[in-house]
């Protein structure tokens, strides 16, 4: 990344970050909203009704300020404003790819030192029949997958439920995609959610669960569970919990068919090897031909792309209602891998298809803004110390 490109990404220096003075209500359940209302003196008999009003304004209509909540009394609005906000994460920068993909860099409180801030990225991918939002669950990642750019950034902290749902709300804000606002043909622009951004969702299970329950609530964000996919590298103990407590579609970052290679590509495999992972998939609640598990397989030249690998993959998935997404490797600075040749990807896909599995090849999106699969990483983490210092100096004079 050039210094000029970095300056476009981040105009506000980290030194000027001001932590929020009041807590945001974003990310709270109805019961938690009622509890907070009790803290400011709302009578017990009114809490449930008032909590439902807040819920509808925040998650259905996308209110950005209590003053917008016209069916709430002026006195109550003032009281809410004195104690709380409905703020989302701060949008530091937006990049738009040549193919229409959008990437937002979002700034969050650090969670410990209130004078510092952290960043995450989320990505919106428009298609003719859907609009998919790729959401992050952690600042950084702990898994160190060798082919993944995010894996080169250390894990900083888990996101809260509010910070996860806040990414969805930011996207709807930026796309003008709320119920009361105009969208093309009256349709929503964000139709699908994939937990495939920064971090391992199942190492932040409770916050991810709470956020996705808001996403899939018919009186909230209102996206069907069948349009929400959670991707995991294989945190086996929480796979069954995902089906039981969240009920969304499951995707597995597989990428190898032999434990020895997967140990290298996805080090989590040393803790939860293929046999345990695939058994958890066979036991996943609700899995069927109508609700197939997606297996993601990044195509690495000369590493995992042989026809023998394809044969082993078909054997491994026997008995699992599955589809296989083949992902051309997206290069990033410093990577040791190359993408498989296109002819080899097609041969691999054809073998799997002839064995009875859907095997689409994922079209890379947003490569020019490092928004494609495996490319996400907080921008301030990417910069060298020298570039970061220069960027801050420029921002201070803007």
Swiss-Prot record:
This is Dual-specificity RNA methyltransferase RlmN. It comes from the Bacteria. It catalyses: adenosine(2503) in 23S rRNA + 2 reduced [2Fe-2S]-[ferredoxin] + 2 S-adenosyl-L-methionine = 2-methyladenosine(2503) in 23S rRNA + 5'-deoxyadenosine + L-methionine + 2 oxidized [2Fe-2S]-[ferredoxin] + S-adenosyl-L-homocysteine; adenosine(37) in tRNA + 2 reduced [2Fe-2S]-[ferredoxin] + 2 S-adenosyl-L-methionine = 2-methyladenosine(37) in tRNA + 5'-deoxyadenosine + L-methionine + 2 oxidized [2Fe-2S]-[ferredoxin] + S-adenosyl-L-homocysteine. Its cofactor is [4Fe-4S] cluster. One of its GO terms (molecular function) is rRNA (adenine(2503)-C2-)-methyltransferase activity. It comes from Rhodopseudomonas palustris (strain BisB5). [4Fe-4S] cluster binds at residues 141, 145, 148. HAMAP family: RNA_methyltr_RlmN (MF_01849). Reaction proceeds by a ping-pong mechanism involving intermediate methylation of a conserved cysteine residue. It is found in: Cytoplasm.
